[in-house]
A protein has these predicted regions:
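A solvent-exposed, acidic/Ser-Thr-rich amphipathic alpha-helical stretch
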Residues: 6, 29-88
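Generic short beta-strand segments
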Residues: 61, 92-98
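Residue-level signal for well-ordered, solvent-exposed loop/turn and beta-edge residues enriched
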Residues: 41, 104, 120-121
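Short, surface-exposed coil-to-beta transition loops
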Residues: 74-76, 105-112
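A short, polar/proline- and glycine-enriched secondary-structure boundary/capping micro-motif
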Residues: 54, 101-104, 133-140
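Short, low-complexity N-terminal intrinsically disordered segments enriched in polar/charged residues
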Residues: 1-34, 38, 144-158
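Short beta-strand edge/turn micro-motifs at domain boundaries
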Residues: 109-141
């Protein structure tokens, strides 16, 4: 038996997903960042390494507040596995662009590696992906968005 139960890690991972969904919807990434321990490390293959909860928060808040992150509000999980002996969670995360107006789905995935600390906290995250795979997906999304008639959202409700 590991240090943590599978149920404890599953619940922490479920909370991680809930907070990512809420933060993607609201634009406030503080609740999501608060899942990390104060000394957590985050490795992001395009942006580099962040050390500490506050550095992770500053990075995620800025990244998801500017394009293209600001148009990427959903992060559904395709699959996940848990190693309860060591406290690891591995998952495939879709980085999904908002609906461009025609209902089409534009997304690209990364593999996320999480290390569970305890008390619902995460001490390590690494997102492994090829940034070059995102460019064609975003280009296709932009093409559809440009051809979709403007709705009240793009006219400020006028």
């Amino acid at each position: 038996m590991g240090r943590w139960s599978r149920a404890e890690i599953e619940e922490a991972f479920a909370e991680y997903q809930r907070r990512a969904a809420a933060s993607g919807a609201s634009g406030d990434w503080r609740p999501w960042a608060d899942l990390f321990t104060e000394d957590a490390r985050y490795v992001e293959h395009l942006y580099g390494r962040m050390e500490g909860r506050e550095a992770i928060y500053r990075w995620i808040q800025e990244t998801m507040s500017t394009y293209p992150g600001s148009d990427m509000p959903e992060f559904p999980i395709e699959w996940h596995v848990i190693d309860e002996e060591r406290g690891w969670v591995l998952c495939q995360v879709w980085n999904r662009m908002r609906d461009p107006g025609d209902g089409s789905v534009h997304q690209e995935y990364n593999i996320t590696i999480l290390h569970y600390a305890e008390d619902g906290r995460i001490t390590y995250e690494e997102d492994a992906y090829n940034p070059a795979n995102f460019a064609p997906m975003i280009a296709a999304w932009l093409e559809v968005e440009a051809m979709t008639p403007c709705t009240s959202a793009c006219t400020g409700g006028m």
